Amino acid sequence: MDLVRVASPEPGPAAAWGPNKCPWATPQNTISCSLSDVMSEQLAKELQLEEEAAAFPEVTVAEGPFITGENIDTSSDLMLAQMLQMEFDREYDAQLRREEKKFNGDSKVCISFENYRKVHPYEDSDSSEDEVDWQDTRDDPYRPAKPIPTPKKGFIGKGKDITTKHDEVVCGRKNTARMENFAPGFQVGDGIGMDLKLSNHVFNALKQHAYSEERRSARLHEKKEHSTAEKAVDPKTRLLMYKMVNSGMLETITGCISTGKESVVFHAYGGSMEDGKEDSKVIPTECAIKVFKTTLNEFKNRDKYIKDDFRFKDRFSKLNPRKIIRMWAEKEMHNLTRMQRAGIPCPTVVLLKKHILVMSFIGHDQVPAPKLKEVKLSSEEMKDAYYQTLHLMQQLYDECTLVHADLSEYNMLWHAGKVWLIDVSQSVEPTHPHGLEFLFRDCRNVSQFFQKGGVKEALGERELFNAVSGLNISADNEADFLAEIEALEKMNEDHVQKNGRKAASFLKDDGGPPILYDE
């Protein structure tokens, strides 16, 4: 095979500086290439492509009914969809404005549907001019007009058209505009479209009434916060009970077990009281929490039980009525301590925290012991309960120097075959100005209950009074009997006023549990 050679270019005319000199350097000789080598390389490349095609066959995708294309531009469709969505949102906002206008009507207080709008206000700036902008408040009829200022000279106009700052029309309109400054809850009416003018006398009376109503509502709100509901507690009491549980003194409070006129009783499981010493005070497994109600409705007519008690007479004050509730709780604590020392079956006091008294629970497994009014006893058990009650009354009068003052079948419990006395917050000493009257009332309640229960040995109210008090008052009827009791009370009161009597030192003698006051 012939070799193909590339001919070198023919030399040009000789340069002026020499026939054999080239200003672009000496040209290199080209390498000769055989035609057979070029054809061999091309054949090898074709064979390699055939082998690759056989090893990796081309995958064909079947054409579907959908439209396909390689160079389809979708940017214009996206813009068109956004424009259509914008128009839909504007139509929705226009409908929302109409609904808002219909919903508010002519009301002075308007409800805004702004949170339900689709289009942002700046996106809706190219709306038509004839469409009313819902946020335009330049001509808002609900906004009071700005009053015309009065110059320093005190009048406006000249000649007959002079208007001073004391003009009746100007002052009336200013007073009408000032009604907007009243409290939100005060109804001032709707004066849109009306030229209302209030005189100074009417405006001042209305202003004073608005302030009075605001103060009255504040007092009612404060009273509601400090009051105690029928079966609930106020926030302060709830916080005190929470602190008892949080400190570990009580494990948990299960619920309400009794509700009275002066207090609410809750059941709780006891824990332990840490007093900073090596040994901690043991609290009963089950406790009763007596919460004295902080409302004074039931205590207003019962102050005679505590204001004439010599133990609390010096501390009683009508100027601090809320502290009377604490004195009731403290009084019951000291009375229970006296009874406990005398061996009378009664709850054991654990702790006194302001108006909350924690005691031992009389019952079992959250079930309180039944009252004598509720329990069904046999004739022998009823007779035994009567003699126990008689002994408890004598023991309470002689050893504890107390009169229950509210003893009845509702304040006596039957538990483990014994009569238990509860609710002694109103108990007083026999030297109380009405102590003997309270004792006679207790004797009447006890005598009537056991006589109705079929106890033949039950004494009458007058015989029971003499048996408990040790007095031998002889009278044919009840009126004379009460007259002699009042005479004895009067004699005792005169003796006290003449000779004086010191308050009982119960703080040293009773040895009760700690009294906690958190001011």
From Swiss-Prot:
Residues 124-134 have a biased composition (Acidic residues). ATP binds at residues 257-265, 290. Keywords: Antiviral defense, ATP-binding, Cytoplasm, Immunity, Innate immunity, Kinase, Magnesium, Metal-binding, Nucleotide-binding, Phosphoprotein, Ribosome biogenesis, Serine/threonine-protein kinase, Transferase. The keyword ATP-binding applies. The modification Phosphotyrosine is found at residue 122. Its EC number is 2.7.11.1. Residues 251-519 form the Protein kinase domain. Coiled coil: none annotated. One of its GO terms (biological process) is innate immune response. InterPro entries: Kinase-like_dom_sf (IPR011009), RIO-type_Ser/Thr_kinase (IPR051272), RIO_dom (IPR018934), RIO_kinase (IPR000687), RIO_kinase_CS (IPR018935), Ser/Thr_kinase_Rio3 (IPR017406). Residues 122-159 are annotated as: Disordered. Autophosphorylated (in vitro). The modification Phosphoserine is found at residues 8, 112, 125, 127-128. Pfam families: RIO1. It catalyses: L-seryl-[protein] + ATP = O-phospho-L-seryl-[protein] + ADP + H(+); L-threonyl-[protein] + ATP = O-phospho-L-threonyl-[protein] + ADP + H(+). It is found in: Cytoplasm. Belongs to the protein kinase superfamily. RIO-type Ser/Thr kinase family. Interacts with CASP10. Interacts with IRF3; RIOK3 probably mediates the interaction of TBK1 with IRF3. Associated with 40S pre-ribosomal particles. Involved in regulation of type I interferon (IFN)-dependent immune response which plays a critical role in the innate immune response against DNA and RNA viruses. May act as an adapter protein essential for the recruitment of TBK1 to IRF3. Phosphorylates IFIH1 within the C-terminal region interfering with IFIH1 filament assembly on long dsRNA and resulting in attenuated IFIH1-signaling. Can inhibit CASP10 isoform 7-mediated activation of the NF-kappaB signaling pathway. May play a role in the biogenesis of the 40S ribosomal subunit. This is Serine/threonine-protein kinase RIO3. The lineage of its organism: Eukaryota, Metazoa, Chordata, Craniata, Vertebrata. The gene is RIOK3.
